[in-house]
UniProtKB/Swiss-Prot annotation:
This is TATA-box-binding protein. It comes from Bombyx mori (Silk moth). InterPro entries: TBP (IPR000814), TBP_CS (IPR030491), TBP_dom_sf (IPR012295), TBP_eukaryotic (IPR033710). It comes from the Eukaryota. Disulfide bonds: none annotated. Belongs to the TFIID complex together with the TBP-associated factors (TAFs). Binds DNA as monomer. HAMAP family: TATA_bind_prot_arch (MF_00408). It is found in: Nucleus. GO terms for molecular function: DNA binding; RNA polymerase III general transcription initiation factor activity. The lineage of its organism: Eukaryota, Metazoa, Ecdysozoa, Arthropoda, Hexapoda.
């Protein structure tokens, strides 16, 4: 064996180690990163021993790896906190502010859209635009003295007296535009006013005129006896069906009178209802009775609306 010629091929023996490049000649992937990592680990060993932490946790703390805190924080979509900017931008993190904002906006919308406690539907709330208007107020007053109607008719302006036709002086004034019926007993009736204040003012003016004629007239027991209001419901009404359904309260004779007469029990009001939708309310002592009667009759009229 020792005298054999050397082979042209360098075949190593069994115990001959393979030729390995030197350590500084080896080509390793990510050599620079690993070298830096080893240096940082060697520098971190004393601090790790002092902290008593594991190398991974200590290395992460030294390298500044972002750690999630245990407390929860609900970010808004309007701005990003420094902690959010340091966290890795994963799709979940990027979507979380939008989801939180969406939940917040949906809660606000639900709170706004939640209905308020509903009240029972009343005729006034069903159509608040319709309000009866006062057309005439009849009031009475006691002048508390005997009157000479011929003297009043001769000396007063805008006064007429025909005892064969009517046993009272009819006197008119322009403001408020009203008419007075003056009786010899000292009683007076004032009609034509559109409001309670105008009716009282007109009655005082008539009493003052009679005082100027030489009578000791006073102003006692002024009282409103009747109020008349009217309104339009703006739709035609089936009066035949109304009188059949509410026969105990109403009467309808189109050959005698074109309107249906409806006598309401409470309030004690008489209504004249026409097929055109016009309604006249009379018999009230205060205007609230007019409004209450219309509130009661409006849903009935709406149920008999012509199609």
């Amino acid at each position: 064996m020792d005298h054999m010629l050397p082979s042209p091929y360098n075949i190593p023996g069994i115990g001959t180690p393979l030729h390995q490049p030197e350590e500084d000649q080896q080509i390793l992937p990510n050599a620079m990163q690993q070298q830096q990592l080893q240096q940082q680990q060697s520098q971190a060993q004393p601090s790790l021993a002092a902290l008593g932490s594991s190398p991974i946790v200590g290395f992460g703390a030294i390298m500044g790896t972002p750690q999630r805190s245990m407390h929860t924080y609900a970010p808004t979509a309007s701005y990003a906190t420094p902690q959010q900017m340091m966290q890795p931008q994963t799709p979940q993190n990027m979507m979380s502010p939008m989801i939180a904002a969406g939940n917040l906006s949906s809660q606000q919308m639900l709170s706004q859209a939640s209905p308020a406690p509903m009240t029972p539907l009343t005729p006034l709330s069903a159509d608040p635009g319709i309000l009866p208007q006062l057309q005439n107020i009849v009031s009475t007053v006691n002048l508390d003295c005997k009157l000479d109607l011929k003297k009043i008719a001769l000396h007063a302006r805008n006064a007429e007296y025909n005892p064969k036709r009517f046993a009272a002086v009819i006197m008119r004034i322009r403001e408020p535009r009203t008419t007075a019926l003056i009786f010899s007993s000292g009683k007076m009736v004032c009609t034509g006013a559109k409001s309670e204040e105008d009716s009282r003012l007109a009655a005082r003016k008539y009493a003052r005129i009679i005082q100027k004629l030489g009578f000791t007239a006073k102003f006692l027991d002024f009282k409103i006896q009747n109020m008349v209001g009217s309104c339009d419901v703006k739709f035609p009404i089936r009066l035949e069906g109304l009188v059949l359904t509410h026969g105990q309260f109403s009467s309808y004779e189109p050959e005698l009178f074109p309107g249906l007469i409806y006598r309401m029990v409470k309030p004690r009001i008489v209504l004249l209802i026409f097929v055109s939708g016009k309604v006249v309310l009379t018999g009230a002592k205060v205007r609230e009775e007019i409004y209450e009667a219309f509130d009661n009759i409006y849903p009935i009229l709406k149920s008999f609306k012509k199609q």
